């Protein structure tokens, strides 16, 4: 995101009234036309002669500002301000966030690092003569420049990830999609994308549904993507070795009257094959082979019940209802990703 210089059009009602500014109907009509307002509405805004400052329109283009300046209406002025421009558009919209008309961050990283990205304005106290001319500088306070923020995001990976989830959303006819790409060695987040998205440079059709950073806010049951944890737990506890096999015959079993089954009878499976075939039987047997506290500690230690430390507004820590008593079936279904909800960011950090 970069700050682009723009102008604001404002009025000093007192000056307008002192100069009989309303006696120039053609100029006021021209001003109303360029601002897309009626003359009556415009003049209502400046009707109170005691007011000294009223915004007529914010963040106008240089061409519009030049046109208004040439109208030369007493009491109508231009003021410098800035507007954020987002080169990546909808690709990174939820991650980067947006600012409001006063350039204050209200979403995403813009909100999180608003103070750092804004800086501190300087000030100057002056003395003027009776005609309003500056005659003396009494006091000057230096401001602080806004800081820069460099992300670990790789824009090429970001764009590719966004393209993929948009296509997947259409293919599977889903209402939303999200993805995160993490460097497994450094932990750097290389991409964080969401769909549907929005164009942060055009605020005319923004809805909360599109603004949500689902990577960190939306929790879901992860299903089979958690199965490696059951294998890891059994290995860590010492119940199995990398060369161990698990008998999944006959492809189903009953636990407390409830059925756990695979899509077919895989028979004897290695640990690697349990993951390759996404075997419910294999992961269930591994999960039930270790003490319950050890199994649950693995889930906690992998960060599935806490936020990721990104410190972004709205981040969910997932949903997990701890129980005083667990049935074998509940532990089995937990091993293949049910009875727990996690965010995309938590799942990415786990791996």
Model feature map: region roles:
Residues 4, 21-22, 26-33, 41-146, ...:
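Small/polar-residue-rich segments within soluble enzyme cores
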Residues 9, 14-34, 116, 206-224:
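Short, solvent-exposed cationic patches
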Residues 72, 103, 157, 164-186, ...:
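Flexible, solvent-exposed loop/hinge segments and secondary-structure transition points
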Residues 128-140, 153, 179, 183-224, ...:
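Beta-lactam-recognizing serine transpeptidase/beta-lactamase-like catalytic domain environment
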């Amino acid at each position: 995101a970069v700050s682009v210089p723009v102008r604001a059009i404002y009025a000093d009602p007192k000056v307008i009234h002192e100069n009989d500014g309303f006696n120039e109907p053609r100029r006021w009509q021209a001003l109303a036309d360029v601002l897309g307002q009626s003359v009556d509405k415009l003049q209502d805004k400046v009707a109170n002669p005691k007011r000294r400052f009223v915004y007529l329109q914010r963040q106008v283009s240089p061409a519009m500002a030049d046109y208004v300046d040439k109208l030369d209406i007493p009491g109508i002025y231009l003021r410098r301000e800035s507007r954020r421009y987002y080169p990546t558009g909808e690709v990174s919209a939820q991650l980067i966030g947006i600012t409001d008309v006063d350039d204050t961050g209200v979403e995403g990283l813009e909100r999180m690092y608003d103070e750092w990205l804004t800086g501190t304005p300087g000030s100057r106290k002056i003395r003027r003569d009776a005609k309003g001319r500056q005659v003396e500088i009494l006091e000057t306070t230096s401001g602080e420049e806004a800081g820069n923020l460099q992300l670990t995001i790789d824009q090429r990976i970001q764009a590719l990830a966004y393209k993929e989830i948009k296509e997947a959303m259409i293919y599977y006819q889903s209402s939303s999609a999200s993805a995160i790409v993490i460097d497994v060695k450094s932990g750097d987040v290389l991409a964080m994308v969401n769909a549907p998205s929005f164009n942060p440079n055009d605020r005319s059709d923004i809805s909360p549904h599109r603004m949500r950073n689902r990577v960190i806010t939306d929790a879901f049951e992860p299903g089979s993507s958690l199965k490696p944890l059951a294998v890891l737990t059994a290995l860590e506890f010492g119940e199995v070795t990398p060369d161990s096999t698990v008998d999944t015959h006959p492809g189903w079993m009953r636990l407390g009257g409830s059925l756990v089954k695979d899509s077919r009878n895989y028979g004897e499976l290695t640990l690697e094959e349990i993951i390759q075939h996404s075997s419910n039987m294999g992961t269930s047997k591994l999960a039930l082979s270790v003490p319950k506290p050890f199994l649950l500690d693995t889930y906690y230690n992998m960060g599935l019940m806490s936020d990721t430390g990104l410190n972004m507004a709205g981040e969910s820590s997932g949903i997990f209802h701890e129980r005083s008593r667990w049935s074998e079936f509940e532990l089995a279904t937990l091993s293949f990703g049910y009875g727990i909800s996690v965010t995309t960011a938590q799942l990415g950090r786990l791996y």
